[in-house]
Amino acid sequence: MGSQDVKGDSYESVYNKILDMQSEPGGANDLRTNRQRSFNIENRYVEKALTQPGVVTKMQDAWTNWTKTNKEEGTPYNMSYSCVLLNVIPTVPMGYAGTVEVSLLDSGLSPLENVIPDQTQMMELGKGPHVMCFFMHYSIPLNDKGRAVKLAFKIDAEMASKGMSVMNVYSYWTQRQGHLSAYSEPQRSTISKLMLGYDKSLKMKTRNDVRRFVGRSLSLHNQEQSVPALLPGQINVMKENVPLYRKESVIDLTREEREKAAQLEMLRKTREVHTQRSAEEMKRRQAELAKDTQRKLAEEAKAVTEKRKNMAGVNSSNIKFGNFDSV
């Protein structure tokens, strides 16, 4: 049957009704817009429709009733999904051995070829979070029974235990629907690795941060860095209200006496410095004298050696050897 112009008011009402149906709460296994989903390792292969099957059935019934009422039977109601974004966050440590393959499916196609061309991406779970983007360049009629656009997850993680989740998936997409069809040039799906930093909250910036943390489990009151002296060497118990660690020699001194004691202490230190310098000078002079003595002894020994050599040369020149032929 040929299509006819639809009535604005009636079409708008059914359009809003269909939109409201998609906002109805679904089951626990349904994947919806802005819905977090944790996929367990025990499900090696998972398919999740972008729109819940129960909602699609209600939408089909609402559209069929509207077309019959308005004598528009056969008029298609089209749905398309563009820019299906997935943030795949592994729940395993860095370097973990395992992969996940994500595809965008059209269940109306052949079971062996239901993956939309160029809409498959694979990531390694041990390389951190990735963002995937899938594109659907055409719309599908709501009239097709059992036809839906799905996300397929194929998980390969042999090292995980049974019932262990290996990733969390956050999804978002743009959906278009209405009596107008949609078709555009196809685009390849993309995958991007997220470059992340380090957790700032794990760093303790100052000693006070460490002190506050340790103070929650260890008493730090009345502690000091140096070793405290329990009692001094001598204690004059005859004097009252005097700190234990104050010097006994300056407790009862007057101001003049303290100044004189300070001057004497300064003279004593000066005398110690001069004495030390004199001792060092004496050591230096003794070292120089020892060097001179060694030098003189070496020169005398050398002179004696030269004298002996000269005497030996003079004596050898007076010796004559006889001739056996003259005898």
UniProtKB/Swiss-Prot annotation:
Residues 252-311 form a coiled coil. The keyword Cell cycle does not apply. Transmembrane segments: none annotated. GO terms for cellular component: host cell cytoplasm; host cell wall. GO terms for biological process: transport of virus in host, cell to cell. It is found in: Host cell wall; Host cytoplasm. Keywords: Coiled coil, Host cytoplasm, Transport, Viral movement protein. Its main location: host cell. It comes from the Viruses. Signal peptide: none annotated. Residues 313-327 have a biased composition (Polar residues). Residues 271-294, 307-327 are annotated as: Disordered. Transports viral genome to neighboring plant cells directly through plasmosdesmata, without any budding. The movement protein allows efficient cell to cell propagation, by bypassing the host cell wall barrier. This is Movement protein. It comes from Soil-borne wheat mosaic virus (strain United States/Nebraska/1981) (SBWMV).
